[in-house]
Amino acid sequence: KSYTDTAYHNEELKSLTRYRFDKVRERAKLKTSISRLVTVLFPELEKLVPSLHMVSVYALLSEFPGAKQIAGAHLTHLKALLKDASKGRYRRDMAVEVRDAARCSIGSDMPAKSLELQHTIRLIRELDSEIEDIEVAIQAIMKEMQSPITTIPGIGFRMGAMILAEIGDFSRFDSPDKILAYAGMSPSTYQSGQLSLSGAYSHMEKRGSRYLRYALYNATKYVCL
């Protein structure tokens, strides 16, 4: 590929990976809001499911946004909703357990919070769809670039794309240390008067590309497993 093609792909990839990064952060904040709202409206639910952030749980809370609404739900409808949303994983016993917990819940009946919960779930679903679209575009560029970075165990196309996008031309860096410095991950040195500390007593500088720093940090976690 020509330099122009490579530069174009890098710029496109950078735009897409940064856009995805911002969308994922936005979604994470909304998920925190979901947890907060459930604690108010139906705190017992969290102990009944592996995670609040599941398709089946969102389907339940979209239609019945609180313990009071779930407590008054018809069991047949509740069972069908959970079964469909979980693709058969949750059946009648789960519906009974959830409704019984709702009927004994200490959760508050707050219509405003219930409405906020429904709207937050809707926003998360929209973000899920947007992130999926972005990832399709990222994968298309990664396929064009044919980089070997994703052959490294633990590095998928998301992290690989972000690393490629932020570093660009690897030949610009003559050592791994230079890449770490560019990411703001090189140890800082504290100096005061005659005292100079580095190594075990230092912290990361946290300058440079926060996107690259995020990608390298997360990639390292999986590569080291």
Regions found by a protein language model. Name each.
Residues K1-L225:
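A detector of single, family-specific signature residues
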